Amino acid sequence: MDALDVSRWQFGITTVYHFILVPLTIGLAPMVAAMQTMWVITGKDSWYRLTKFFGKLFLINFALGVATGIVQEFQFGMNWSEYSRFVGDVFGAPLALEGLVAFFLESTFLGLWIFGWSRLPKLVHLATIWLVAIGVNASAFFIIAANSWMQHPVGAIYNEETGRAELTDIWALLTNNTALAAFPHAVAGAFLTAATFVAGISGWWMVREARKKKTENERGTLPADGVTPQAALPATDSRSMFRSAARMSFIVMIVAGGALAITGDIQGKLMFEQQPMKMASAESLCDTETGASFSLLTVGTHNNCESVVHLIAIPGLTSFLAENDFGATVQGVNQLQDQYEQQFGPGNYKPNLFVTYWAFRMMIGLAAGSALLAVAGLWVTRGGRIPDQKWFSWLSLLAIPTPFLANSAGWIFTEMGRQPWVVAPNLSGVDQIRLTVDQGVSDHPVGLVVASLVTFTLLYAALGGVWFYLLRRYVIEGPLDHDAHPHVDPPESEDDEPKQLSFAY
């Protein structure tokens, strides 16, 4: 491999590591805010305990997300200096807005939320977590706006004297139709991820506590159907508490899943228009077809169109996804390659067909894990029931990673499907604003890039291990006893000596 390949591997590995954490942060912040809102409205201590419990998990994820995200912006100057030189005037604007507006908003009010328990009025403290939720989603918008400019550049001109793109209209960049389509799709995926995370943990805790109570025989024999009515439990029972969180999450999962399908369809149709090569590669559609099918299973060497064989396919579905018409004509990879050679000169304009094809299907298929948990969860918790079936505990745990993997697959598809472009040409925009990966990479010795690849991969692996260890530890630990009742301050000491300031959440 040359320096270009290693640089791409490094950027891909660090981005996927970081993007595992991002959707959970985006979706979990408003869910924690909703839990705290329920506590403020109802006054039930169970919602307070849920807020503190899932708030702790949110803080762990947020901290590791910041740690892995800091390196991302430095990547552009490290291995992609030519890219930075070419688009710096444009790309820097949304990144600056993300840092100066969104990140400062979420960081400031997150600090107030952490230290504001028992110190701020209830409604003021509640407002801080909602502002955190707004901040993390605003941060996502600015990042997606920057990435969408790479997918579909608008609001810029090409300066022939400097040989780079220059921003002329920040509003056009922020209202780029690519960004407006991608943002709600990404947010829906984030809500699905967070809701599955909360539902999975809550489902596991419900079954764990129900089986524990059953074994200890503290409440007598359970009914024959293996569930305990919620009404039979005290209000502070952890089973009842986690059932409330699970039911809320199941509903969020269904709504987010529907939003994913709708926004995904909108974004897909836009990509057929703006990046037809990406969508043709997603289907391994080698030649132009009328009434193009959508394949569920394809075999062959996917980077060689001559060997691709579609074994199981749904007739006309790709055409429908492209233009809402089962008989529409969809351009194939070979024809688009010829078109791009005429328009942009000699070169290979085909992305990696194997990666784009399977990443697209993984993105869609893995969402089934969340759907299965939502449907099963609503059924086993119906009518106030609290499940103790072991299969539901396993389903809850196994469903948790599926939306994380689906989000990563979607991100890989989005980026790999754009190759070889790092700034894809806007076919109706400024012709000179385009850049391929080999034009954007830094001129570093391959050994230096390999060293940084190994270093960052090991560092991120260590951070990933810390992330998993902390989440696992505090999930198993569960809600703490001192969180059973809100706003309980420690007794005042008669000792007048000043104490060292400490923090514990």
Please give the residue ranges for each predicted region.
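Polytopic transmembrane helical bundles with strong interfacial aromatic enrichment
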Residues: M1-Y505
